[in-house]
Amino acid sequence: MQTSPLLESLMEALRCLPGVGPKSAQRMAFHLLQRDRSGGMRLAQALTRAMSEIGHCRDCRTFTEQEVCTICTNARRRENGQICVVESPADIHAIEQTGQYSGRYFVLMGHLSPLDGIGPQDIGLDRLEVRLSQEAVSEVILATNPTVEGEATANYIAEMCAAHGVLASRIAHGVPVGGELEMVDGTTLSHSLAGRHPVTR
């Protein structure tokens, strides 16, 4: 069946989103055109503004419309002395929702992957090293993902921190709250046993 070139273009554009295949893209496109054109216009305007106006923070590399993000300009957070290293801006959002961290961040926008040609400078580690040498950093919290690449990246950064006399710590990995022990994979269980702590009363 021959369809509108514009409709085909819309469906193809929607497929750039993660997890969206041909059928999902078709369903979204028809929904916007048939039932929610005003929502489609708002989406188009928001996307256009976001793509043109959102850049990266000069200090931590997260997404922001300003040269420096609000977290990095917060005096209380600057005095904290902690930098939490994460792989993506989405990780910052997740950590902020816990309300348990009051320092600043550094976003790698990925992880080390020599097989893919991704080295230290590709994920901004040269800029992190500048911060370690110029700022009063007391601790770097390594919150990269618990993958082979994430662990390799964390180890590399830990060595950088040691060279600058800065404490490096790794976030704990283990059994999820509400999970059943028999369903947990061996690697996670190993991390849990290695990272056990005394029970306090």
Curated annotation (Swiss-Prot):
Alphabetical keyword list: DNA damage, DNA recombination, DNA repair, Metal-binding, Zinc, Zinc-finger
Superkingdom of source: Bacteria
InterPro entries per record: DNA_Rcmb_RecR (IPR000093), Rcmb_RecR (IPR023627), Rcmb_RecR_Znf (IPR015967), TOPRIM_dom (IPR006171), TOPRIM_RecR (IPR034137)
Mapped zinc finger ranges (C4-type): 57-72
Coiled coil feature spans: none
Disulfide pairings: none
Any Gene Ontology biological process: DNA recombination
GO MF annotation: an example: zinc ion binding
Record bears the keyword Nucleotide-binding: no
Gene3D superfamilies: 3.40.1360.10, 6.10.250.240, RecR Domain 1
One Pfam family here: RecR_C
Domain Toprim, residue spans: 81-176
PANTHER family noted in UniProt: RECOMBINATION PROTEIN RECR
Cross-referenced HAMAP family: RecR (MF_00017)
Family label: Belongs to the RecR family.
NCBIfam families xrefs: recR
Task performed by this protein: May play a role in DNA repair. It seems to be involved in an RecBC-independent recombinational process of DNA repair. It may act with RecF and RecO.
Protein name as annotated: Recombination protein RecR
